[in-house]
A protein has these predicted regions:
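Conserved, non-catalytic sequence blocks in retroelement Pol enzymes and Pol-derived host proteins
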Residues: 6-13, 82-94, 109-119, 137-147, ...
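Basic, alpha-helical interaction scaffolds
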Residues: 64-135
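Short, conserved micro-motifs composed of acidic
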Residues: 11, 17, 24, 28-69
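Short, charged alpha-helical motifs in flexible N/C-terminal segments and linkers
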Residues: 23-41, 48, 72, 143-210
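Amphipathic alpha-helical
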Residues: 202-244
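Short beta-strand->loop micro-motif that forms the acidic, two-metal-ion catalytic signature
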Residues: 1-3
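Charged boundary/loop elements
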Residues: 7, 28, 36, 127-144, ...
Length: 279
């Protein structure tokens, strides 16, 4: 259930009403909703909004559902401030911690050849970094650098002892990998292109793609245009997927956007290598 509103009382009433409707629907189908396994996460920035957030509550029958500071959803840790510290670097279950554990496990392949080590490292390191990257890619640079350190350690392991003094560019090129920032640009832009091309998922498409009312250069190049109600002043909004997708998609040439998907992917990767610095 998603209820966007600034008034905590309105949010509480709407959420409680939604909960009652779901409870009635489940009871009519001989199912039971468990309030102990229903969680409440209220997103807000800093300042007054953060104070108002504490007033939100949900009445679930005789029980009162209390707010959570963070919750795990589809493998990602969502924090009520919209920040990604806990997911990327904050604890045993963070991405950095998991990557460090996987790097230790890779040492068992020390005697394997380059191809074997590259295949395994791509599967266990690269895939972990890439998962949900369009979502958390707006995280501060110091968090992204922590991921970049782990990626370079994996690349150095794959390339062997002779790569100890190699540059970052040479390491990544030898492995055929993009840096974390380059991957973030690539995956976010690719997802934006799929949304624009297929009009799916419909919710994101209607939010992100508004028709150009005037034939401008942005219109002819197929750039994403938000509606007039969109506001991008807050820090949380500027780091969001939609904001970054619009900004990245505007950077690539219009000629790329009309290519078949396979060609688009190839040229987008080349564009990322040329234009996004390795950080």
């Amino acid at each position: 259930m998603l209820v966007p509103d600034k008034n905590p009382q309105t949010v509480s009433e709407k959420l409680s009403d939604h909960y009652r409707k779901i409870e009635q629907y489940m009871h009519s189908n001989k199912l039971v909703i468990n309030s102990d396994k229903t969680y409440l996460l209220v997103m807000a920035g800093r300042g007054a909004a953060s104070t108002r957030r504490m007033e939100v509550q949900v009445q679930a029958g005789p029980d009162l559902i209390e707010q959570s500071v963070s919750e795990k959803l589809l493998g990602g840790v969502i924090h009520n401030t919209g920040r990604w510290n806990e997911m990327i670097k904050g604890g045993k279950g963070s991405i950095v911690s998991q990557l460090a554990g996987r790097l230790n496990a890779l040492k068992k392949l020390q005697q394997a050849d380059f191809k074997c080590k590259l295949t395994v490292a791509t599967a266990v390191i690269q895939s972990k970094i890439q998962y949900l990257l369009p979502l958390y890619g707006g995280a501060p640079d110091y968090l992204v650098r922590a991921l970049q350190v782990q990626q370079l350690k994996a690349a150095r392991f794959v390339c062997g002892y002779s790569s100890f003094y190699w540059s970052r560019d040479k390491l990544l090129k030898t492995c055929g990998w993009l840096s974390v920032r380059q991957q973030e640009f690539y995956s976010t832009t690719l997802l934006a292109h799929k949304i624009v091309s297929t009009s799916l998922p419909h919710g994101l498409w209607t939010d992100m793609v508004q028709p150009h009312t005037v034939r401008t250069r942005a219109a002819t190049q197929g750039q994403i245009r938000f509606g007039t109600n969109y506001r991008g002043e807050s820090e949380m909004t500027r780091s969001s997927f939609k904001y970054r997708a619009q900004r990245y998609y505007s950077r690539i040439p219009g000629t790329m956007k009309i290519q078949p998907l396979s060609s688009f992917k190839k040229h987008l990767k080349q564009f990322a290598v040329r234009n996004i610095p390795v950080k």
